[in-house]
Every structure is written in C-alpha cells, then in structure tokens.
C-alpha cells in the first residue's frame, strides 16, 4: 500500500463557515475557530458540545497537553471519523484529534515545539481547531498542567 493511504482526500466543504468555540482551563480562556479542512471531525465534535474532560501533559510529544479518550470513537451519523487534514507537526495553538488505531483516541493541543507521538512512534491527528485568541496564554496553561497535573478543560460553542 505504501504512501497511497496518505494521499489527500476530496473534502466535503458544504459548510465551510468557521464556528468559534470558547475553551476554558486553569482559569484561562481561549477562543478557537474550526478548520474547514476537517469537516467530518468538526461536525462530529460540535455535536458533543459543551464538552468537559481532563487535560494532562503529553509524555512523548514535547510541549503540548492532551485529553486521553481511551477507546472512544468520535462518530458522525454513526460512522467513526477517520483521518482528514492530519499532521504530526501542530503549530502553537493547533488542536488535533487522533481517532485511535496505534494508540488511544485523544485530543492534543500544542503550546510550544511539538511532534505528535506515542510510545509506538510518530502519530498524525486531524487539525480541526485553531486558537485565534489567547494564544499568548497557552504556555501558562502548559506549565500549570505539567507541574500541577490533570486539569478540567471545557469546549463550548460561542
């Protein structure tokens, strides 16, 4: 199969309007916009809102925080979300959804240099949200989670 499975797919951009979300954690507030290049991930995630979980510091990926989701399957009309607009190199403020497979399902948010990985090796996640306001506070969040442990994080539509 080689790299054929990694070739770009045709995107369904019927609704490319970006939705804004408020993300709160550790007393900090961030505003994120959905990414039109990940329509299936965005549509399925928006159905979960408001969404609260625990966020912890990454173990293998560098400067990032993640929401471990175990065997959870993000679904869109009963179909599990697969890979779309996926990357291993999130920029500061990028939020990725990893649908599982080699490692557990998760959401990862970069606050500094980050290469998305697990003990199994490099991973790629769907870039579905980008923080557009409050990005300068991400390092504060990351350091707090690193030194103080798991924190609540909430995603809600504005």
Protein language model annotation of sequence segments:
Residues 11-37:
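N-terminal intrinsically disordered, low-complexity, charge/repeat-rich segments that act as generic
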Residues 24, 33-158:
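Glycine-rich active-site loops that engage anionic ligands at enzyme catalytic sites
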């Amino acid at each position: 199969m080689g790299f054929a499975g990694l070739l770009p797919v045709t995107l369904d951009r019927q609704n490319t309007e970006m939705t804004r979300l408020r993300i709160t954690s550790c007393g900090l507030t961030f505003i994120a916009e959905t990414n039109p290049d990940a329509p299936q991930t965005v549509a399925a995630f928006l159905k979960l809102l408001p969404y609260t979980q625990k966020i912890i510091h990454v173990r293998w990926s560098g400067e990032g925080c993640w929401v471990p989701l175990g065997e959870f399957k993000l679904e869109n009309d009963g179909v599990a979300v697969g890979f779309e607009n996926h990357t291993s190199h999130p920029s500061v403020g990028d939020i990725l959804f990893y649908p599982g497979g080699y490692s557990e399902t998760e959401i990862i948010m970069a606050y500094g240099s980050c290469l998305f990985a697990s003990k199994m090796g490099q991973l790629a996640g769907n870039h579905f949200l980008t923080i557009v306001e409050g990005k300068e506070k991400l390092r504060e969040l990351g350091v707090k989670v690193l030194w103080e442990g798991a924190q609540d994080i909430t995603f809600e539509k504005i």
